[in-house]
Amino acid sequence: MATARATICNKKGLHARAAAKLVKTAASFDARIEVIRLPRAGEEQDPEAKAGATSILSLLMLAAERGVDIELHGEGAQAQEALDAIVALVGRKFDEEE
């Protein structure tokens, strides 16, 4: 299993347009990707705070606002490439102008 971490750094967080871009990126690879919202300092991990990377609704339910760390788990032939692409997308603030 491939893993990676990223910090949501765009102003609006993981909103609908950003989630759609993440889904499009994830779907372009031969891999199954899970996104986990990590707790902030002092919070406990919510066992429900995970989503499949190809489900916009599930990603929106993570409520991942600016500053939230996410962990990505990937399985499949292109898992590492998929995670690298998603981490790059998040790092580019989902290609949004702020």
Regions of interest found by a model, annotated:
Residues 8, 48, 71, 75:
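Generic anion/oxyanion-binding catalytic loop in active/binding sites
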Residues 61, 65-98:
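C-terminal structural segments of small proteins and small subunits
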Residues 1-9:
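Short amphipathic
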Residues 2, 31, 68:
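Residue-level signal for beta-strand positions within conserved beta-sheet cores that form or flank
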Residues 9-65:
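Compact, glycine-rich, soluble single-domain proteins
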